[in-house]
């Protein structure tokens, strides 16, 4: 980093990698003129673990536990992208019941990720109370995850061709109860935060990104939608069963930190709508033991239909990836999570390139903080929403 040659006495400050507001091991070298930011240089790589190279020496089923360590707050999405690639390479069909359960898990994971963004973001700008509120709702989601997958985090639930296990007894009723409860809590967040004049002073007009600028920087997710671009891969690519549900893309025009907050808050409400529709329309209904009903062929043969299964086949460790390449992507809470996959007719991928949304979105940070105040760095960085596990990989 070159020190600007001026007549002013500039100060260079290291923020991180151990600063509590860095959201992981991010280091910023900030050049200050008093309280004004002259330059900012992010230093990455403190959490690099070679995830792409590890993939080249593992079968997909062996690699699944690794991918949950990218974005460890939204692990369902990393699992989804890991199985979606081989499914498309092998033209593997997923039963509709399994696809619906995947959608439910993905949207619950999206809400949990947005909640754990909201609490620390508010703490960064000086509001401690919401930090404790969000853990209350997040615990309910983790209880649902634990009942369905056995793990509160790092679920290892998705499989090539479906999911690892069907939903347990009573899970659907618990999830519907959570949906009704959570909608009232979102209203509470709006009353507590959105109309707070101190909060508005800190975020309104801070870190503005225009629509064209957002596209040029390759931004995605709430960062892009808050800049007036209603782009959501769930609508564009229509993967899983998202095209069967009624929901709207949430977006704002202002492009500032407040707009990014509003997009994420309203996205949680839309996720609840999707979950409720998926639960009510789940193929096979809420009956838990579909496998035992499958044996009753004489009484009701429809339960043997492909769509009612939760998984087609348990994948073999020797599952071969055909000799071709493709790019597959999902709409993760932080943006477009993609994988460029090259198979070579073996059990291991020849190339596994990860496109993490946090890494791309973080690149615009130096442009946003220039000519801003030192305290605004925390607001802008918090509004981007990064997890260093996926930034460094």
From Swiss-Prot:
Reactions this protein catalyses: a plastoquinone + NADH + (n+1) H(+)(in) = a plastoquinol + NAD(+) + n H(+)(out); a plastoquinone + NADPH + (n+1) H(+)(in) = a plastoquinol + NADP(+) + n H(+)(out)
PROSITE patterns for this protein: COMPLEX1_49K
Locations listed in the record: Plastid, Chloroplast thylakoid membrane
EC id: 7.1.1.-
Lineage top rank: taxon: Eukaryota
This protein's record includes keyword Plastid: yes
One Pfam family here: Complex1_49kDa
Signal peptide residues on this chain, from the entry's feature table: none
UniProt key word Ribosomal protein: no
Keywords: Chloroplast, Membrane, NAD, NADP, Plastid, Plastoquinone, Quinone, Thylakoid, Translocase, Transport
InterPro entries attached to this UniProt entry: NADH_Q_OxRdtase_suD, NADH_UbQ_OxRdtase_49kDa_CS, NDH1_su_D/H, NiFe-Hase_large
Membrane topology reported for the UniProt record: Peripheral membrane protein
Major subcellular site: plastid
GO biological process entries: photosynthesis, light reaction
Record's subunit section: NDH is composed of at least 16 different subunits, 5 of which are encoded in the nucleus.
Record's function text: NDH shuttles electrons from NAD(P)H:plastoquinone, via FMN and iron-sulfur (Fe-S) centers, to quinones in the photosynthetic chain and possibly in a chloroplast respiratory chain. The immediate electron acceptor for the enzyme in this species is believed to be plastoquinone. Couples the redox reaction to proton translocation, and thus conserves the redox energy in a proton gradient.
HAMAP family: NDH1_NuoD
NCBIfam families: PRK06075.1, PRK07415.1
Protein name (record): NAD(P)H-quinone oxidoreductase subunit H, chloroplastic
């Amino acid at each position: 980093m070159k020190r600007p040659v001026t007549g002013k006495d500039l100060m260079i400050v290291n923020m991180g990698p151990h600063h509590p507001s860095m959201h992981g091991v991010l280091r910023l070298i900030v050049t200050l003129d008093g309280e004004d930011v002259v330059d900012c240089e992010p230093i990455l790589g403190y959490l690099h673990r070679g995830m792409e190279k590890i993939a080249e020496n593992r079968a997909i089923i062996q690699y699944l536990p690794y991918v949950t360590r990218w974005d460890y707050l939204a692990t369902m999405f990393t699992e989804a992208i890991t199985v979606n690639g081989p499914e498309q390479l092998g033209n593997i069909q997923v039963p509709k019941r399994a696809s619906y359960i995947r959608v439910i898990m993905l949207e619950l994971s999206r809400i949990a990720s947005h909640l754990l963004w909201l609490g620390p973001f508010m703490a960064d700008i000086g509001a401690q109370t919401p930090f404790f509120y969000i853990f209350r709702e997040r615990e309910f989601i983790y209880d649902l995850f634990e009942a369905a997958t056995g793990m509160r985090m790092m679920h290892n639930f998705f499989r090539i061709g479906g999911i690892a296990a069907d939903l347990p007894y009573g899970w659907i009723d618990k999830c519907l109860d959570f949906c009704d409860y959570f909608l009232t809590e979102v209203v509470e967040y709006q009353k507590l935060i959105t109309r707070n004049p101190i909060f508005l002073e800190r975020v309104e007009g801070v870190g503005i990104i225009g629509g064209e600028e957002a596209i040029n920087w390759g931004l995605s997710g709430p960062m892009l939608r808050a800049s007036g671009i209603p782009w959501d891969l769930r609508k564009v690519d229509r993967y899983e069963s998202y095209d069967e549900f009624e929901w709207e893309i949430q977006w704002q025009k202002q492009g500032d930190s407040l707009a990014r907050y509003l997009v994420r808050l309203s996205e949680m409400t839309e996720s609840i709508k999707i979950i409720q529709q998926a639960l009510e329309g789940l193929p096979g209904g809420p009956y838990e033991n579909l496998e035992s009903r499958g044996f009753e062929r004489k009484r009701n043969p429809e339960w043997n239909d492909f769509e009612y299964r939760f998984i087609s086949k348990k994948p073999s460790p020797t599952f071969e990836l055909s000799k071709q390449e493709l790019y597959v992507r999902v709409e993760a809470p932080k943006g477009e999570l993609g994988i460029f996959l090259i198979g070579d007719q073996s059990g291991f991928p020849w190339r596994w390139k990860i496109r993490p949304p946090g890494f791309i979105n973080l690149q615009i940070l130096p442009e946003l903080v220039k000519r801003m105040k030192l305290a605004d760095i925390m607001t802008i960085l918090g509004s981007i929403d990064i997890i260093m596990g996926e930034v460094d990989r």
